[in-house]
Amino acid sequence: MHGFILFVTYTMKHGTREEFLREVKECGVLEEIRREKGCLGYDYYYPVDKSDELCILEKWEKEEDQIRHLDQPHMDKIKVLKSRYVLDTQMEGIKC
């Protein structure tokens, strides 16, 4: 497989992870992201031993697709939610 994988870790405000995920699902942004050109996968995961962290595994055909994704209008929904619930964001990208 050729492509770009991005592993994102959010440090959440204490006790807000479930509320953040509920709002992400309700606003429909996941479906919009998954329909973007070049998106091969976009999934949330929980670290087993860190209740205030949330991880995203993004899979893209090309790194350029992931960069374009950040400027999509529906990403404004995520930015608003992150401002309410997320303290810090760490990212690690891998070209494969």
Label each PLM-derived region with a short phrase:
Residues H2-I5, L40-D52, K77-C96:
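Glycine-rich beta-strand-turn "strand-cap" elements at beta-sheet edges
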Residues K13, D71-H74, L87:
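Charged, amphipathic alpha-helical interaction segments
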Residues E23, Y45, H69-Q72, L81:
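Residue-level signal for well-ordered alpha-helical positions
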Residues F4-T11, G41-L70:
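Short, well-ordered beta-strand segments in beta-rich or mixed alpha/beta enzyme
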Residues T16-L40, H74-K77:
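Short amphipathic alpha-helical segments
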Residues H2-R17, R22:
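Short, structured interface segments that constitute the first stable element of a domain
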